[in-house]
Regions:
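OB-fold ssDNA-binding interfaces and closely related basic DNA-contact patches used
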Residues: 1-173, 236
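Extended acidic low-complexity intrinsically disordered regions
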Residues: 1-28, 267-268, 272-273, 279-280, ...
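Compositionally biased, intrinsically disordered low-complexity regions enriched in proline and serine
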Residues: 32, 39, 68, 82, ...
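Compact mixed alphabeta submodule
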Residues: 129-263
Length: 310
């Protein structure tokens, strides 16, 4: 059989239609991983572990909260997805949020779930031990957390009165000189989904730097400014997200839905019934309440570091 016939026998257009992009176009790196973010490597069984330390950034921020679009739609056995941070985080319009709002207002709550946004939490971490990728050790990354993981941190930082009465003490998660490391553990659950339920705070307080000056230098030079994630230019533009909306909804070749043709309007507050859609307090000033820990020496160390970041 001539070679050219073999090539013609493969339908490149069908492949493009199936995945929603031209797999051989230069822009295929649009799905490349953001190397600033740490990803815990898992084995074939879904297990993975690393030892990390949370750090403040050079502007003293500990954690920022962001909305994320995570939409997957299947049509005629073809699956397409979008996984992007939403500009609704900072009050800018987002076509996915608008579509969710329209469907919700029409009473189509199940369909609206396809366009709902999740809440994610971002922090700086330093990798202390990474058995699967030892080359990561000593490096600082951004780490994206779920609400469940963030709650685990909050409970460690600020235990309830009941827990305190039972002997539990606040942990110094963001203190690099006299604080607690965090054991990040991934496992595959009974539902076949990866979870981080086994992750835990290390009880022993340790220092990951020799001096305050060393800590300040590393934080200033190598952490990522969390405030930069909240700048408009850090998000895809409305037009770019509209193109993503049309692609994921298989609407590229048809008239765009009304939701993306309307004049851009402020995002409408979400109904109470869907907590993940509820607007949050502006995240620019979000910091972990480290100072609530009672140990004076630990607080003194952290205060010295934060003063050095001014």
């Amino acid at each position: 059989m001539p070679v050219e016939n073999s090539v013609d026998a493969f339908n490149f257009n069908a492949l493009k239609d199936a995945v929603g992009i031209d797999p051989f176009a230069k822009q295929t790196n649009k799905y490349a991983r953001d190397e600033r973010f740490y990803v815990l490597q898992k084995d074939k069984n879904g297990n993975g572990a690393a030892l990390i330390r949370f750090l403040p950034d050079s502007e003293k921020r500990m954690i920022v909260q962001m909305y994320k679009i995570n939409t997957t739609i299947t049509k005629n056995d073809k699956k397409r997805f979008v996984n992007e941070f939403s500009p609704a985080t900072i009050g800018l319009p987002c076509p996915f949020q608008e579509k969710w709002q329209d469907l919700w207002n029409e009473g189509k709550k199940d369909e609206a779930k396809n366009f709902s946004r999740s809440i994610r939490y971002i922090a700086n971490i330093k990798i202390l031990k990474d058995p699967a990728n030892p080359e990561n050790e000593g490096k600082i990354f951004l780490y994206e957390m779920s609400g469940a993981m963030n709650s685990k941190l909050e409970k460690a930082l600020n235990p309830s009165e009941t827990d305190v009465s039972l002997g539990k003490t606040p942990k110094q998660l963001f203190n690099p000189l006299k604080g607690n490391s965090f054991r990040l553990v991934a496992q595959r659950g009974s539902n076949n989904q990866i979870n981080y339920d086994a992750s835990e705070v290390v009880a022993e307080e340790t220092s990951i730097y020799q001096t305050v000056e060393e800590a300040i230098k590393d934080i200033k030079e190598n952490t990522y400014k969390l405030g930069d994630l909240l700048k408009p230019e850090s998000f895809k533009s409305y037009d770019e997200l509209k193109k993503e909306f049309l692609r994921v909804t298989f609407a590229e070749q048809t008239a765009a839905p009304t939701v993306v043709q309307e004049t851009v309007a402020p995002v409408t507050p979400a109904p109470v019934e869907t907590p993940v859609q509820t607007p949050v307090t502006p995240v620019q000033e979000t910091v972990a309440p480290v100072a609530s820990a009672p140990a004076p020496s630990a607080n003194d160390d952290l205060d010295a570091i934060l003063q050095g970041l001014v």
